[in-house]
Amino acid sequence: MKKLSQILNLNKLKVVKKNIHKAHGLPNECYTNDDYLNIERKKIFENKWIVIGVGSSIPNIGDAKPFDLLGIPLIILRDKNKKVRVYHNVCSHRGYKILQEKCKIKNVIRCPYHSWSYDFNGKLVATPHIGGMNKHNCSKFSKSESGLKAVSYTHLRAHETINH
């Protein structure tokens, strides 16, 4: 990750803290530069608990919805034990976004791209045609290493929070 001094002229930031009559807003790079956004994400959100919703928004077993945390796609899901789970909304096969909108999941979380399927615990359970036409298994591929990536999560006073 780049340092702030590699992204913008630090003198531009000093002007922000000046007396109100001489101060300026943040430089344009702070709003348009991806490297700056990455630094900001790290400083503000890394290793901190962040509220991402309330459990009542997914009250029933199988209720699921996508959530975008500053460009990081997540899935919030109510599992079969009524526990809330949070995963990265990215299929381990081709990186495709699994959920596009709020939905009700019956048995598996299925990627719309190649139908790779995950159970409510994030475990990869189906890999259609991975070994060729109508061959759904491959001895050289381990499903156990390709599940959905879980996000640290807790329920705090009716709020769903993650530590990313």
Walk through the language-model features, giving the residues of each:
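Single conserved hydrophobic/aromatic residue that forms the stacking wall/gate
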Residues: H155-A158, I162-H164
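N-terminal pre-ligand scaffold of iron-sulfur
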Residues: M1-E101, K149, Y153
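Long, hydrophobic, well-ordered secondary-structure blocks that form the structural core
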Residues: R85-S142
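A generic structural signal for well-ordered coil/turn residues at beta-strand boundaries
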Residues: P112, G147-K149
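Short Gly/Pro-enriched turn/cap motifs at secondary-structure boundaries
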Residues: F141-E145, S152
